[in-house]
Amino acid sequence: MDLGYLYGLICSIYGAVEDWRKREVTDFLWISMLWVGVFIHLLYNKSLLLFFIEIFAVLFITLSVRYEKFNKLVYIGVFLFLLSFILFKSYFALSFLVFYLIGIFLYYLNFMGGGDCKFLMGLSYLKGMFFTFIIFLNAILFVIPYCIFILLINLKNGNHKRLKLKNLPLLFIALKKDIDKVKKFETIMGDDENLSLIPNINEEKEEKKTYKGKVWVTPQLPFLVFICLSYILYIVSPFPLIFKVIELVIKSHF
Protein backbone atom coordinates (compact mmCIF):
# COMPACT_ATOMS: atom_id res chain seq x y z
CA MET A 1 0.00 0.00 0.00
CA ASP A 2 1.91 3.06 -1.24
CA LEU A 3 1.78 6.71 -0.22
CA GLY A 4 -0.34 7.68 -3.23
CA TYR A 5 -2.95 5.07 -2.38
CA LEU A 6 -3.09 6.16 1.27
CA TYR A 7 -3.49 9.83 0.40
CA GLY A 8 -6.16 9.01 -2.16
CA LEU A 9 -7.98 6.94 0.48
CA ILE A 10 -7.92 9.84 2.94
CA CYS A 11 -9.29 12.18 0.26
CA SER A 12 -12.01 9.70 -0.73
CA ILE A 13 -13.16 9.30 2.90
CA TYR A 14 -13.24 13.05 3.50
CA GLY A 15 -14.93 13.62 0.15
CA ALA A 16 -17.53 10.93 0.87
CA VAL A 17 -18.51 12.60 4.15
CA GLU A 18 -18.72 15.99 2.44
CA ASP A 19 -20.70 14.62 -0.49
CA TRP A 20 -23.16 12.82 1.78
CA ARG A 21 -23.80 15.89 3.92
CA LYS A 22 -23.81 18.69 1.33
CA ARG A 23 -23.64 17.07 -2.12
CA GLU A 24 -20.68 19.37 -2.68
CA VAL A 25 -16.97 18.63 -2.64
CA THR A 26 -14.22 21.15 -1.99
CA ASP A 27 -11.73 21.74 -4.81
CA PHE A 28 -8.93 21.31 -2.28
CA LEU A 29 -9.23 17.51 -2.51
CA TRP A 30 -8.56 17.05 -6.20
CA ILE A 31 -6.04 19.90 -6.37
CA SER A 32 -4.12 18.46 -3.41
CA MET A 33 -3.98 15.07 -5.17
CA LEU A 34 -2.29 16.79 -8.11
CA TRP A 35 0.32 18.38 -5.83
CA VAL A 36 0.98 15.21 -3.85
CA GLY A 37 1.13 13.25 -7.09
CA VAL A 38 3.70 15.50 -8.76
CA PHE A 39 6.13 15.07 -5.84
CA ILE A 40 5.52 11.32 -5.49
CA HIS A 41 6.21 10.82 -9.20
CA LEU A 42 9.53 12.66 -8.78
CA LEU A 43 10.68 9.83 -6.49
CA TYR A 44 10.32 7.33 -9.34
CA ASN A 45 11.27 9.55 -12.27
CA LYS A 46 14.48 11.51 -11.78
CA SER A 47 13.99 13.83 -14.78
CA LEU A 48 13.95 17.39 -13.44
CA LEU A 49 12.62 18.76 -16.74
CA LEU A 50 9.61 16.42 -16.54
CA PHE A 51 9.10 17.47 -12.92
CA PHE A 52 9.16 21.19 -13.74
CA ILE A 53 6.80 20.81 -16.70
CA GLU A 54 4.25 18.94 -14.60
CA ILE A 55 4.61 21.12 -11.51
CA PHE A 56 3.91 24.19 -13.67
CA ALA A 57 0.93 22.34 -15.16
CA VAL A 58 -0.41 21.75 -11.65
CA LEU A 59 0.34 25.35 -10.68
CA PHE A 60 -1.60 26.80 -13.62
CA ILE A 61 -4.56 24.49 -12.92
CA THR A 62 -4.50 25.49 -9.24
CA LEU A 63 -4.51 29.21 -10.11
CA SER A 64 -7.40 28.69 -12.55
CA VAL A 65 -9.45 27.05 -9.79
CA ARG A 66 -8.44 29.43 -7.00
CA TYR A 67 -8.95 32.70 -8.90
CA GLU A 68 -11.89 33.05 -11.27
CA LYS A 69 -10.18 35.78 -13.30
CA PHE A 70 -7.43 33.28 -14.14
CA ASN A 71 -9.77 30.43 -15.14
CA LYS A 72 -8.33 30.29 -18.67
CA LEU A 73 -5.00 29.14 -17.22
CA VAL A 74 -6.42 25.63 -16.99
CA TYR A 75 -5.81 25.27 -20.73
CA ILE A 76 -2.12 26.06 -20.26
CA GLY A 77 -2.00 23.40 -17.56
CA VAL A 78 -3.64 20.86 -19.85
CA PHE A 79 -1.23 21.80 -22.65
CA LEU A 80 1.76 21.27 -20.35
CA PHE A 81 0.48 17.81 -19.42
CA LEU A 82 0.13 17.07 -23.13
CA LEU A 83 3.69 18.31 -23.66
CA SER A 84 4.90 16.08 -20.82
CA PHE A 85 3.31 13.06 -22.46
CA ILE A 86 4.71 13.89 -25.91
CA LEU A 87 8.27 14.52 -24.69
CA PHE A 88 8.58 11.98 -21.88
CA LYS A 89 5.70 9.54 -22.46
CA SER A 90 4.50 10.44 -18.96
CA TYR A 91 1.88 7.87 -17.95
CA PHE A 92 0.43 10.11 -15.25
CA ALA A 93 0.15 13.10 -17.59
CA LEU A 94 -1.71 10.88 -20.06
CA SER A 95 -3.92 9.60 -17.23
CA PHE A 96 -4.92 13.14 -16.32
CA LEU A 97 -5.65 14.01 -19.96
CA VAL A 98 -7.83 10.91 -20.41
CA PHE A 99 -9.92 11.64 -17.33
CA TYR A 100 -10.03 15.34 -18.16
CA LEU A 101 -11.84 14.41 -21.38
CA ILE A 102 -13.99 11.77 -19.65
CA GLY A 103 -14.91 14.28 -16.95
CA ILE A 104 -15.99 16.91 -19.49
CA PHE A 105 -18.05 14.27 -21.32
CA LEU A 106 -19.81 13.03 -18.16
CA TYR A 107 -20.38 16.54 -16.84
CA TYR A 108 -21.97 18.03 -19.94
CA LEU A 109 -24.18 14.97 -20.43
CA ASN A 110 -25.42 15.44 -16.85
CA PHE A 111 -24.20 11.97 -15.84
CA MET A 112 -22.02 13.27 -13.01
CA GLY A 113 -21.53 16.42 -10.99
CA GLY A 114 -18.50 18.64 -11.40
CA GLY A 115 -17.02 17.70 -8.02
CA ASP A 116 -17.12 13.98 -8.83
CA CYS A 117 -15.50 14.50 -12.23
CA LYS A 118 -12.71 16.64 -10.79
CA PHE A 119 -12.05 14.10 -8.05
CA LEU A 120 -11.49 11.43 -10.71
CA MET A 121 -9.11 13.79 -12.55
CA GLY A 122 -7.06 14.29 -9.41
CA LEU A 123 -7.05 10.59 -8.61
CA SER A 124 -6.01 9.69 -12.16
CA TYR A 125 -2.90 11.84 -11.88
CA LEU A 126 -2.12 10.59 -8.38
CA LYS A 127 -2.50 6.86 -9.10
CA GLY A 128 -2.85 6.47 -12.87
CA MET A 129 -5.75 5.83 -15.21
CA PHE A 130 -5.98 2.05 -14.88
CA PHE A 131 -6.35 2.28 -11.11
CA THR A 132 -8.90 5.09 -11.52
CA PHE A 133 -10.89 3.10 -14.09
CA ILE A 134 -11.14 0.20 -11.61
CA ILE A 135 -12.29 2.54 -8.84
CA PHE A 136 -14.81 4.21 -11.17
CA LEU A 137 -16.28 0.96 -12.52
CA ASN A 138 -16.62 -0.60 -9.07
CA ALA A 139 -18.26 2.60 -7.82
CA ILE A 140 -20.91 2.19 -10.52
CA LEU A 141 -21.62 -1.26 -9.09
CA PHE A 142 -22.49 0.31 -5.72
CA VAL A 143 -25.08 2.53 -7.43
CA ILE A 144 -27.26 -0.52 -8.17
CA PRO A 145 -28.35 -1.29 -4.55
CA TYR A 146 -28.88 2.45 -4.01
CA CYS A 147 -31.32 2.54 -6.94
CA ILE A 148 -33.06 -0.62 -5.71
CA PHE A 149 -33.50 1.04 -2.30
CA ILE A 150 -35.16 4.05 -3.97
CA LEU A 151 -37.41 1.69 -5.96
CA LEU A 152 -38.57 -0.09 -2.79
CA ILE A 153 -39.43 3.22 -1.12
CA ASN A 154 -41.47 4.28 -4.16
CA LEU A 155 -43.32 0.95 -4.29
CA LYS A 156 -44.03 1.09 -0.57
CA ASN A 157 -45.46 4.61 -0.89
CA GLY A 158 -47.48 3.73 -4.01
CA ASN A 159 -45.68 6.34 -6.10
CA HIS A 160 -45.89 4.12 -9.19
CA LYS A 161 -49.66 4.21 -9.52
CA ARG A 162 -50.05 7.46 -11.48
CA LEU A 163 -46.90 7.16 -13.56
CA LYS A 164 -47.07 6.66 -17.29
CA LEU A 165 -45.30 3.59 -18.66
CA LYS A 166 -42.53 5.65 -20.29
CA ASN A 167 -41.75 7.28 -16.93
CA LEU A 168 -41.41 4.06 -14.88
CA PRO A 169 -37.56 4.26 -14.86
CA LEU A 170 -38.08 7.28 -12.62
CA LEU A 171 -38.87 4.86 -9.78
CA PHE A 172 -35.18 3.91 -9.64
CA ILE A 173 -33.70 7.41 -9.47
CA ALA A 174 -36.22 9.77 -7.86
CA LEU A 175 -38.53 10.13 -4.89
CA LYS A 176 -41.89 11.85 -4.63
CA LYS A 177 -42.31 14.46 -1.92
CA ASP A 178 -44.13 17.65 -1.06
CA ILE A 179 -42.72 20.72 -2.80
CA ASP A 180 -42.12 22.42 0.57
CA LYS A 181 -39.87 19.57 1.72
CA VAL A 182 -37.46 19.64 -1.23
CA LYS A 183 -33.90 20.13 0.03
CA LYS A 184 -31.34 22.41 -1.56
CA PHE A 185 -29.24 19.55 -2.98
CA GLU A 186 -32.25 17.81 -4.54
CA THR A 187 -33.20 18.43 -8.17
CA ILE A 188 -36.85 18.78 -9.16
CA MET A 189 -37.68 16.57 -12.14
CA GLY A 190 -41.33 17.59 -12.41
CA ASP A 191 -44.75 16.42 -11.27
CA ASP A 192 -46.89 13.53 -12.52
CA GLU A 193 -47.99 15.50 -15.57
CA ASN A 194 -44.70 17.08 -16.60
CA LEU A 195 -41.62 14.93 -16.05
CA SER A 196 -38.02 14.73 -17.20
CA LEU A 197 -36.14 11.44 -16.88
CA ILE A 198 -32.76 13.19 -17.01
CA PRO A 199 -32.05 15.42 -14.01
CA ASN A 200 -30.19 18.64 -14.78
CA ILE A 201 -27.77 18.17 -11.89
CA ASN A 202 -25.29 20.71 -13.24
CA GLU A 203 -27.76 23.51 -13.96
CA GLU A 204 -29.44 26.05 -11.74
CA LYS A 205 -32.20 24.60 -9.56
CA GLU A 206 -35.68 24.86 -10.97
CA GLU A 207 -37.96 27.32 -9.22
CA LYS A 208 -40.23 25.66 -6.66
CA LYS A 209 -42.98 28.19 -7.27
CA THR A 210 -43.80 26.63 -10.64
CA TYR A 211 -45.15 23.51 -8.90
CA LYS A 212 -47.83 22.76 -6.34
CA GLY A 213 -48.35 19.69 -4.18
CA LYS A 214 -46.00 16.73 -4.70
CA VAL A 215 -43.09 16.62 -7.13
CA TRP A 216 -40.50 14.08 -8.21
CA VAL A 217 -36.99 14.90 -7.04
CA THR A 218 -33.67 13.17 -7.47
CA PRO A 219 -31.50 13.19 -4.35
CA GLN A 220 -28.40 13.39 -6.58
CA LEU A 221 -26.31 10.30 -6.03
CA PRO A 222 -23.51 10.91 -3.51
CA PHE A 223 -21.08 9.35 -5.97
CA LEU A 224 -18.02 10.04 -3.85
CA VAL A 225 -19.51 7.72 -1.22
CA PHE A 226 -19.49 4.96 -3.84
CA ILE A 227 -15.96 5.92 -4.89
CA CYS A 228 -14.87 5.62 -1.25
CA LEU A 229 -16.47 2.16 -0.93
CA SER A 230 -14.85 1.13 -4.20
CA TYR A 231 -11.51 2.41 -2.92
CA ILE A 232 -11.76 0.22 0.17
CA LEU A 233 -12.94 -2.73 -1.93
CA TYR A 234 -9.78 -2.40 -4.03
CA ILE A 235 -7.76 -3.71 -1.08
CA VAL A 236 -9.64 -7.01 -1.31
CA SER A 237 -10.22 -7.19 -5.06
CA PRO A 238 -8.10 -5.00 -7.40
CA PHE A 239 -10.33 -5.89 -10.35
CA PRO A 240 -13.47 -4.31 -11.88
CA LEU A 241 -16.13 -6.45 -10.19
CA ILE A 242 -18.83 -5.12 -12.50
CA PHE A 243 -17.27 -7.24 -15.27
CA LYS A 244 -17.52 -10.29 -13.01
CA VAL A 245 -21.18 -9.56 -12.30
CA ILE A 246 -21.92 -9.19 -16.03
CA GLU A 247 -20.10 -12.47 -16.69
CA LEU A 248 -22.16 -14.28 -14.03
CA VAL A 249 -25.42 -12.86 -15.41
CA ILE A 250 -24.54 -13.95 -18.96
CA LYS A 251 -23.52 -17.45 -17.83
CA SER A 252 -26.73 -17.86 -15.86
CA HIS A 253 -28.80 -17.23 -19.00
CA PHE A 254 -26.82 -19.27 -21.53
From Swiss-Prot:
This is Uncharacterized protein MJ1282.1. The chain crosses the membrane at residues 33-53, 70-90, 92-112, 133-153, 223-243. PANTHER family: PREFLAGELLIN PEPTIDASE (PTHR36506:SF1). GO terms for cellular component: plasma membrane. It is found in: Cell membrane. To M.jannaschii MJ0902. It is a multi-pass membrane protein. Keywords: Cell membrane, Membrane, Transmembrane, Transmembrane helix. Pfam families: Peptidase_A24.
